[in-house]
Structures are given as structure tokens and as C-alpha cells.
């Protein structure tokens, strides 16, 4: 049976159940209602989750993670298959939640320019091993980009943030 958006997000409270048979509390239900409102998903509460757009579904998955009250939020390509506008919205929401909820957020991102917008610290891997660690300003230099990605390009700055323009 397909899950509603409410049910999908409520799954994030499962770890807080007193037992597998106890059911969700009024507190759990209130938390989900509040987070649906915060994430702009309240109007989709009864809708089948799989019918959401890519951006809406990404927000629903993020809401499910946040309603579990984590200390660390681990995101694997949270912008995958999203258009640029929705990708930026999701990352801004992640950044806001990280600050407001005092979370540590670890995200796998393959878009250097999106990472530049959102990440305080970046780890660059080569062969599955950390090769470089630092801010976008420290890492987005021609030598490192060529070493890690085999990429030649220009680094431009906008609002004091570096962006990569491949050649």
C-alpha cells in the first residue's frame, strides 16, 4: 500500500517508539505536523508520497530525517535528479536546519559549484581516500582541481565565493 507524505515522515519517529507495538504518541504526530508545515509540505499531507515532484520528495525525505531528532545528518547526493532551483532550495534548507538545530551535516555532493554555496568545509577524495580538506576558497585552485578531477578550468569569484568554469 502506498504511503502518504504524513506516513513517510512519521517513519522518522520509529526509533523513538517505546516498543515495536506501542504505536506513535500524540507528541510524535504533533512533531510530524509541525515539520510538514516547516518544510512546506502540509498541503501534501494526505497525498501519496510517490506522486510528489522531485523537489517535494527530496524535502519529504529530509523532513523524515529531521523529525528523528538526529545530532548528525548524513545526506547522500540530496540534490540528485533535481533541477538547479530545487537543488539550491534543498541545500539552503539543509544549511538552515544545520544552524537552527545545531546539527553536524555531512553531504555527498558532486557539483563543485553547489558545494561552494553551502559547505563550510569540503573533503575531496581521490581513489576513495581523503586527498584534500578545507574551504572552497582553499581547495578551488587549478592545481587541486586538475589533480582530483583531471579538470582544467577557470575559478571565478562572485560574492566572495569561488565557482569553477571548466574549459
Each model region followed by its residue ranges:
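Conserved ABC ATPase "signature" region
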Residues: 10, 25-44
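Conserved ABC ATPase signature
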Residues: 48-52, 56
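Conserved catalytic motifs of ABC-family nucleotide-binding domains
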Residues: 69
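Catalytic Walker B motif of ABC-type/P-loop ATPase nucleotide-binding domains
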Residues: 73-77
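Helical segment within the ABC ATPase nucleotide-binding domain
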Residues: 88-101
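Conserved switch/coupling elements of ABC/ABC-like ATPase nucleotide-binding domains
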Residues: 123, 127-138
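ABC ATPase nucleotide-binding domains
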Residues: 146-167
Amino acid at each position: 500500500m502506498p504511503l502518504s507524505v504524513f506516513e513517510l515522515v512519521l517513519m522518522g519517529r520509529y526509533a523513538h517508539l517505546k516498543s515495536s507495538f506501542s504505536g506513535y504518541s500524540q507528541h510524535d504526530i504533533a512533531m510530524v505536523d509541525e515539520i510538514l508545515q516547516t518544510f512546506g509540505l502540509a498541503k501534501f499531507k494526505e497525498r501519496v508520497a510517490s506522486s510528489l515532484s522531485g523537489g517535494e520528495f527530496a524535502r519529504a525525505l529530509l523532513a523524515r530525517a529531521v523529525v528523528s531528532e538526529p545530532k548528525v545528518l548524513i545526506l547522500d547526493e540530496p540534490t540528485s535528479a533535481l533541477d538547479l532551483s530545487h537543488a539550491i532550495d534543498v541545500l539552503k534548507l539543509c544549511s538552515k536546519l544545520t544552524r537552527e538545530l545545531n546539527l553536524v551535516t555531512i553531504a555527498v555532493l558532486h557539483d563543485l559549484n553547489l558545494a561552494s554555496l553551502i559547505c563550510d568545509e569540503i573533503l575531496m577524495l581521490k581513489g576513495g581516500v581523503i586527498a584534500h580538506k578545507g574551504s572552497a576558497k582553499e581547495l578551488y585552485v587549478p592545481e587541486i582541481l586538475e589533480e582530483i578531477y583531471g579538470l582544467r578550468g577557470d575559478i571565478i569569484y562572485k560574492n566572495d565565493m569561488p565557482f569553477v568554469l571548466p574549459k
